C-alpha cells in the first residue's frame, strides 16, 4: 500500500530520536524520498510529514495560484519556508528539531497519524483531543449529508459491463 494509514505512539529516546513506524517507513522507501520532509501543519498543532507525495500535493496547490500573488507567497512561506528535511538513520529513526517539538508541543512521546499521501506527528494528548473533535464533526456532517434529498436525475451505478 502506498498510503500512510493508522496511528502509532512512540517514545523519544535520550538523544531526541524517535522511530518512524515500519509501515510508514515502507511507504517512504517506495516513494524514493531521501529523508523525511516536514513542515508545521497549517490546520493543526502538528507536523505534516512525507516524501515526494507530500511535495507533489504542495506543488499542485501552489500551481493553482498566481505566481506573484499574495496568496501564493503566504502558502509558499507556510509550506516551504518553514520546512525541514530530517535525516532518517539506518534504524528508521529521526531526530526531531527544537522547532518541530516546540510547534507541536512535543515532550517525551509522539503519535504518528496516517493521512494518505502524508502523515502527521502529534503530541499524544493533543491528538486524542483532535480525534474526538474530528469524530464529532464527521458525525454532524454525516447527519447533514444523509438528510439531503437525492437528486431526481441521479442514477445508481450499474455493474461493470451492464447494458442499458
Curated annotation (Swiss-Prot):
Residues 7-60, 83-126 form the SpoVT-AbrB domain. It holds the Pfam family MraZ. PROSITE patterns: SPOVT_ABRB (PS51740). SUPFAM superfamilies: AbrB/MazE/MraZ-like. GO terms for molecular function: DNA-binding transcription factor activity; transcription cis-regulatory region binding. It is found in: Cytoplasm, Nucleoid. InterPro entries: MraZ, MraZ_C, MraZ_dom, MraZ_N, MraZ_sf, SpoVT-AbrB_dom, SpoVT-AbrB_sf. Its main location: cytoplasm. GO terms for cellular component: cytoplasm; nucleoid. Forms oligomers. This is Transcriptional regulator MraZ. It comes from Beijerinckia indica subsp. indica (strain ATCC 9039 / DSM 1715 / NCIMB 8712).
